[in-house]
From Swiss-Prot:
Keyword flag tRNA-binding: no
Pfam family name, one: Ndh2_N
Predominant location: plastid
Keyword Nucleotide-binding: no
Family: Belongs to the complex I subunit 2 family.
Protein name (Swiss-Prot/TrEMBL): NAD(P)H-quinone oxidoreductase subunit 2 A, chloroplastic
Lipid bilayer topology: Multi-pass membrane protein
NCBIfam families (UniProt xref): NDH_I_N (TIGR01770), PRK02504.1 (NF002701)
GO terms under cellular component: chloroplast thylakoid membrane
Length: 510
C-alpha cells in the first residue's frame, strides 16, 4: 500500500516536471531553435544506431552534418534580431552571443568531414564519436548564451565532459589514456576553482546568479570594491585561464594534443577557445565591470606569458601536434588583446575576425596532419622532409596554412593580426602589442623551418616514411579533401577581402 502511494506521488511529480518543461520549451523554444535542431539530430542518431547495422554508417555522417548546417541556417535567419532573455533569465540571445555560436557550429561542421577518413581507417566507433561532437557543440552554444552562473557551469561541464571522453576515445592507446587522465584531473580542478569564484560573486551580490543582477546586487550591498571581489576575480581568471590554455595554466595542453586522436585535437583546439573566449568576455565585462583595471592587468600578464612561453617552447618540439599545442598557447595570447580592448577601438570585432581566420588556418593544418599520419603512421616533424616530391598538393597546402598562422602577407593571418595589434596600439597597450609582434616573428621561424623540410629535395634528408609514401585512395569519398580545400581558401582569400569581413563584424556587433 505504501509502495503504491509512493509510486503515484512519483508519477504526479514527474508529470508536473514534464509539463513545466514542455511549457517552457513551447514558449521559449524559438529562442533556442539552433540548439533544438542539434538535440533532434542527437535523438535521431541514437534511434538509427539502435535499429541499424554497419551498412548505415554513411547516414550517421549525413545526419550530423545536416543538423549542423540546419542549425547554422536557423542562426543566420535569426541574425540582427533584438536581444531577448528567455527561460526565466537563464538564457540570452543577442548578436554578440550568436557570432560565437556561429563560430562553434562552423568548427564542428568542418571537423566532421575531417574526421571521416580517420574513423574509417582506425575503425573507431562512429556513433559515439559523432554524439560526443554534437553534444560538445551543444554545450558550447549554450555556454555562449548562458546568462546566469548555474547555466554557465552546466553548459561548461557539458562541453568539458564530452572533451574528456573524446580525448580518450582510442582507449587501447596508452598515450590517449594518459592524456585523458591528465585532462580530467586538471579540468576537474579548474572547474572547482571556477565554481569557488562564482560562490564569491553569489555571496557578495546578496544571492544573485544572473550576470546583470550580480552587478545590481554588488551596487546594493556596496561590495563592488571589496577585497572579496578581487578574490573572486583571481579564482575565475584561473578557471577560465585553464579552459583557454593560457600560461601558466597550459600544462595539460601539449600532452592532450599529443595523446588524443588527431581529429579530436583539431576539434578541441578551436571550439574550446571560441567557447571559453565567449565566456571570458561576458564574465569580465558584466560582473567585473567595476574591476576593469584589475582584470585588464591580470589578462595582460597572462597574455604576455602565453605569447612568450608558447612560441619559444614551440621551437624545441619534435612532434607536429605538440608544436601546434604550444603555438595555440601563443595564438590565444593574441586573442586576449581583443578581449582587453573590448568595445572600444573595434577590439571585439577584430578578435572575432581573427578567430574566424584562426579556425580556417588551424583546421587546415590539422587536416593535413591527419592525412599524412594515416599514410605514414608518424607525427614527427623530421619525417615530413621531402614531402613535396611525393605529394605537392599536400605539402603546398600545409605550407600555406603554416604561413598564414605565422602571419605572413598577403595571407589571412597577417591581416587578422595586423588589425588586432592596431586595435591594441590605439587602446594604449604598447608593451603588449610589442611582445605580440616580437613573438609573431619567432613563430614565423619555426613555421618556416617546417616548410623548408617539406620542400627539401636532397635524398639524404628524406626519411623512409616519405620515401615509401603512397597516395592511397581515400575511403570516404574525398571528405577530408573537402575540408582541406575549404580551409586553404579561407586561409588565403580573406586576406584580400579583410575590410568587408571586418565591416560585417562591426555592423553586427554595433
Amino acid at each position: 500500500m505504501i509502495w503504491h502511494v509512493q509510486n503515484e506521488v512519483f508519477i504526479l511529480d514527474s508529470t508536473r516536471i514534464f509539463m513545466k518543461a514542455f511549457h517552457l520549451l513551447l514558449f521559449n523554444g524559438s529562442f533556442i531553435l539552433p540548439e533544438c535542431i542539434l538535440i533532434f539530430g542527437l535523438i535521431l542518431l541514437l534511434m538509427i544506431d539502435s535499429t541499424s547495422d554497419q551498412k548505415d554508417r554513411p547516414w550517421f555522417y549525413f545526419i550530423s552534418s545536416t543538423s549542423l548546417v540546419m542549425s547554422i541556417t536557423a542562426l543566420l535567419f535569426r541574425w540582427r534580431e533584438e536581444p531577448m532573455i528567455s527561460f526565466s533569465g537563464n538564457f540570452q540571445t543577442n548578436n554578440f552571443n550568436e557570432i560565437f555560436q556561429f563560430l562553434i557550429l562552423l568548427c564542428s561542421t568542418l571537423c566532421i568531414p575531417l574526421s571521416v577518413e580517420y574513423i574509417e581507417c582506425t575503425e573507431m566507433a562512429i556513433t559515439e564519436f559523432l554524439l560526443f561532437i554534437l553534444t560538445a557543440t551543444l554545450g558550447g552554444m549554450f555556454l555562449c548564451g548562458a546568462n546566469d552562473l548555474i547555466t554557465i557551469f552546466v553548459a561548461l561541464e557539458c562541453f568539458s565532459l564530452c572533451s574528456y571522453l573524446l580525448s580518450g576515445y582510442t582507449k587501447r592507446d596508452v598515450r590517449s589514456n594518459e592524456a585523458t587522465t591528465k585532462y580530467l584531473l586538471m579540468g576537474g580542478a579548474s572547474s572547482s576553482i571556477l565554481v569557488h569564484g562564482f560562490s564569491w560573486l553569489y555571496g557578495l551580490s546578496g544571492g544573485e546568479i544572473e550576470l546583470q543582477e550580480i552587478v545590481n546586487g554588488l551596487i546594493n550591498t556596496q561590495m563592488y570594491n571589496s577585497p572579496g571581489i578581487s578574490i573572486a576575480l583571481i579564482f575565475i581568471t584561473v578557471g577560465i585561464g585553464f579552459k583557454l590554455s593560457l600560461a601558466p595554466f597550459h600544462q595539460w595542453t601539449p600532452d592532450v594534443y599529443e595523446g588524443s586522436p588527431t581529429p579530436v585535437v583539431a576539434f578541441l583546439s578551436v571550439t574550446s577557445k571560441v567557447a571559453a573566449s565567449a565566456l571570458a568576455t561576458r564574465i569580465f565585462d558584466i560582473p567585473f565591470y567595476f574591476s576593469s583595471n584589475e582584470w585588464h592587468l591580470l589578462l595582460e600578464i597572462l597574455a604576455i606569458l602565453s605569447m612568450i612561453l608558447g612560441n619559444l617552447i614551440a621551437i624545441t618540439q619534435t612532434s607536429m601536434k605538440r608544436m601546434l599545442a604550444y603555438s595555440s598557447i601563443g595564438q590565444i595570447g593574441y586573442v586576449i588583446i581583443g578581449i582587453i580592448v573590448g568595445d572600444s577601438n573595434d577590439g571585439y570585432a577584430s578578435m572575432i575576425t581573427y578567430m574566424l581566420f584562426y579556425i580556417a588556418m588551424n583546421l587546415g593544418t590539422f587536416a593535413r596532419i591527419v592525412l599524412f599520419g594515416l599514410r605514414t603512421g608518424t607525427d614527427n616533424i623530421r619525417d615530413y622532409a621531402g614531402l613535396y616530391t611525393k605529394d605537392p598538393f599536400l605539402a603546398l597546402s600545409l605550407a600555406l596554412c603554416l604561413l598564414s598562422l605565422g602571419g605572413l602577407p598577403p595571407l589571412a593571418g597577417f591581416f587578422g593580426k595586423l588589425h588586432l595589434f592596431w586595435c591594441g596600439w590605439q587602446a594604449g597597450l604598447y608593451f603588449l602589442v610589442s611582445i605580440g609582434l616580437l613573438t609573431s616573428v619567432v613563430s614565423i621561424y619555426y613555421y618556416l623551418k617546417i616548410i623548408k623540410l617539406l620542400m627539401t629535395g636532397r635524398n639524404q634528408e628524406i626519411t623512409p616514411h616519405v620515401r615509401n609514401y603512397r597516395k592511397s585512395p581515400l575511403r570516404s569519398n574525398n571528405s577530408i579533401e573537402l575540408s582541406m580545400t575549404v580551409c586553404v581558401i579561407a586561409s588565403t582569400i580573406p586576406g584580400i577581402s579583410m575590410n568587408p569581413i571586418l565591416a560585417i563584424a562591426q555592423d553586427t556587433l554595433f
